[in-house]
Structure formats: C-alpha cells, structure tokens
C-alpha cells in the first residue's frame, strides 16, 4: 500500500514525455503523504460496485437533494448531510487500506490499467449505461475507482509512518481521508487532474464527498 518508487518513476516518465500539463514539483513534494510503502493484510470484505447514486442516496435520505448531479443515476455527493447518511446506512465506510486494495485490484501500477497517464474519458460519474459501467470495471468488478472523491473511515494523517499492518482505519480527531476525485473536476482544465485517478493518491476531506459502502463477509 502506498506510492512506490516504481510509481513515482512512472509519473516522471509521463512528465519527461510531455504528458503532464504543468510542472509536477508539487506532486513529488507531496508524495510523502502516501509513503512509506508498506504491506497490509486485508481480510475479505464486500464493497459496492460503484459509489452511491442519487437514487440510492434517496432510499436512505428521502429528502436528499444534489445540485451537482445530472440524473438519479449519477454519483451522489454529500456534505452537511454526510453524518445523516452514515447514521442511516446499515453499512460502513471502507478503511483507506481497503479502498486502495479495491482500487488496485491486484496491480502495483499507477492505475489498474497500467502506468500510462489516465485520460478524462476514464472518468465515470453516471451508471445508467450498463455496458459503459461494465467496460470500466477493474479485475475485482469495481467501476469508477478514483472518479469521485470518496471518503474513507480513517482520520487524515499525512503519511503512513507507524500505520497498522492490517486494514483497520486509523482513528482520532480531524478530517477524514478521501481517495480519488478526478471526476469532480470535470471538465478538466489542463491542471493535471489525472493525478487524482492514481490508486495511491490521497488527501484530506474538505468539502463534498461520495460514499462507496462496505460490509463484512456474511457468516454461514
């Protein structure tokens, strides 16, 4: 788990080949936030195929409104109503380790697609088209990992030093961790928004966020 030396080298290759929109000095300086790389033991769990949609959010919050979404099948985003949603859901948030494990789907590259620069056409924010959703799935059958800013159970700590070796969330006071967000900035403005699609990219929650529910494996 974390941003590896090989992944940093892959970003440098993209930059040297004029694949970056701007100087990536700030990205490399902030890479410490996703390091050091460590091995994490992740127990089996269930995770939603994609973030909650507007229609799904209204199942739990009937009064939910979303001025950002274009349709009921679009990703729902929460801000002031996040705590209400989490109180109503019979599920939990993924830990940060679970989220990255799900996003990587067995890979160690920048995204599950490889070390190439992600394109904006890989962003998925609406799930009405089953064919398009299926084509966006990773090897675990998960779609839109990295497209929306997705909140995790962990509190934000700007590094992985002394982080647990299992997938438990790190707790405490302060904002939570968010992962992804490439679609929240669409249409892209040439500001290297593609970096938000990387499996290892992490940040602290500031405004609205999407939710991808998680549940334990059922017992027999």
How should each PLM-predicted stretch be described?
Residues 206-220:
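Short, structured beta-strand segments at or near domain termini in extracellular proteins/domains
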Residues 36-37, 130-134, 200-205:
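Short Gly/Pro-enriched turn/cap motifs at secondary-structure boundaries
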Residues 15, 25, 189, 193-200:
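Small-residue (glycine/proline)-centered packing/hinge motifs flanked by hydrophobic/aromatic residues
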Residues 32, 37-39, 167-170, 202-203:
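Short secondary-structure boundary/capping segments
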């Amino acid at each position: 788990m974390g941003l590896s030396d090989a992944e940093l080298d892959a970003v440098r290759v993209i930059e040297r080949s004029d694949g970056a929109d701007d100087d990536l000095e700030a990205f490399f300086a902030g890479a410490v936030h996703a390091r050091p790389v460590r091995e994490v033991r992740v127990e089996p769990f269930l995770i939603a195929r994609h973030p909650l949609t507007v229609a799904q959010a209204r199942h739990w919050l009937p009064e939910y409104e979303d001025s950002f979404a274009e349709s009921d099948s679009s990703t729902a985003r929460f801000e002031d109503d996040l705590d209400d949603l989490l109180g109503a859901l019979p599920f939990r948030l993924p830990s940060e380790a679970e989220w990255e494990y799900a996003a990587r789907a067995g890979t160690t590259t920048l995204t599950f697609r490889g070390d190439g620069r992600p394109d904006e056409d890989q962003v998925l924010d609406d799930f009405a088209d089953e064919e398009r959703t299926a084509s966006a799935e990773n090897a675990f059958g998960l779609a839109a990992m990295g497209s929306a800013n997705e909140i995790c159970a962990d509190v934000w700590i700007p590094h992985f030093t002394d982080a647990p070796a299992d997938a438990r969330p790190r707790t405490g006071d302060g904002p939570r961790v968010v992962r992804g967000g490439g679609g929240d900035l669409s249409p892209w403005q040439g500001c290297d928004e593609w970096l938000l699609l990387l499996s290892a990219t992490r940040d602290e929650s500031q405004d609205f966020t999407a939710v991808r529910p998680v549940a334990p494996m059922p017992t027999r």
